[in-house]
Amino acid sequence: MSQLPGAPTPESHLCVACVQMRSGLEVGPNIDAASALIRRAADEGAELIATPEMTSLIDRKPGAVFAKSTTEDADPALAAFRQLASELNIWLLIGSLPIRVDQERCANRSFLIGPEGAIAARYDKIHMFDVQLNAGNIYRESAGFAAGSEAVVARTPKANVGLTVCYDLRFPHLYRDLAKAGAELIFAPAAFTRITGEAHWHVLLRARAIESGSFLIAPAQCGKHADGRETYGHSLIIGPWGEVLAEAGVEPGIIAARLDLKEVGEARAKIPSLTHDRTYRGAGL
């Protein structure tokens, strides 16, 4: 990533970065890998930095994530990232960590951390990816993770931000609701597979940005993981008109862009669809 210009930015401008990772089976090395990339992004001028879904651990073996997870107050990754945000004086969105919430399941939980190291917002992934493709190919995210039930918009000094995670991308009403609640920038950290990513990743993110008139910040997992999973990469930063402002490739690294938040109001003025919802009936509704 080329260094962001060092001149002071207008009040409406915000320098954001996505960290693209290939998280593995052990929490410690994943913390180290994420921290190194976060430091690099901060050194290059980013004020708000986001990491992907499951930053601290990817292990698809049944029960493995739960066995390696902890409660929020004991989570080593969360503690490390809170300290790092304070040290670097940045806003930090940790795409998600597995946080134990009962005796069998975790929450797939995002954390927005402020520059003093305090947790400004939490969001538990609402939509669980449960699918049976054939008799031998079944994936049930809900077996290991408890679904969230609350949409979240957080207020920061420069922008109102909405929080989502991965599979949430396929539910456009969530993004419209976040925008209606004031979100100007929406995070979509993810771990899309290579197959679904190639087919849908760019289309979904651009559509959600256009529909909501919001910036979309989508840090991704990438490549062949130690557990055998293959994720798509291609972290994206997208403007409210649907334009791609920055895109990663298929290797770990960072991308960045300088956002002008005035563009949110401009896009919504040109296409004011957020104010044009109507009730309707028919089609069996």
Show which residues each predicted segment covers:
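Active-site catalytic loop in hydrolytic enzyme cores
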Residues: 101-181, 194-203, 269-273
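Short beta->alpha transition motifs characteristic of CBS
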Residues: 57, 111, 122-129, 236, ...
